[in-house]
């Protein structure tokens, strides 16, 4: 099965969020860099842009939703897991058209693809708590 355009947009967005977190560059510059330097065929570019800019502009709000569910200092969370959590929390909170099960499953897949060995379990646990399933 081919990945959907939105799945590809999420994958690119989490990489861009990761880059933004580490570089501290302006989010518009990061967006431009990713859209000009990455292969974007088959990607929902509009959704990519929304995920990236929305996550960046709502970062403080998103982090306030995440941090109560983490049992260690937030700055000790790996940057890739933080990027996945921020992206998924943005979708869960601000994209009501995306079913929470889809947002969580996509986040788990992103954590498996980019995160540490058991990073997907950590991401799943936090997101379940955010949506109130635990």
From Swiss-Prot:
GO MF entries: RNA binding
Biological processes per GO annotation: DNA-templated transcription termination; transcription antitermination
Protein name per its UniProtKB record: Transcription antitermination protein NusB
Function: Involved in transcription antitermination. Required for transcription of ribosomal RNA (rRNA) genes. Binds specifically to the boxA antiterminator sequence of the ribosomal RNA (rrn) operons.
Keywords carried by this UniProt record: RNA-binding, Transcription, Transcription antitermination, Transcription regulation
Cellular component GO terms, alphabetical: cytosol
Family: Belongs to the NusB family.
PANTHER family tied to this protein: ANTITERMINATION NUSB DOMAIN-CONTAINING PROTEIN, N UTILIZATION SUBSTANCE PROTEIN B-RELATED
Source organism per UniProt: Shewanella woodyi (strain ATCC 51908 / MS32)
Any Pfam family matching the protein: NusB
Presence of the UniProt keyword Transcription regulation in the record: yes
CDD domains in alphabetical order: Terminator_NusB
Primary gene name: nusB
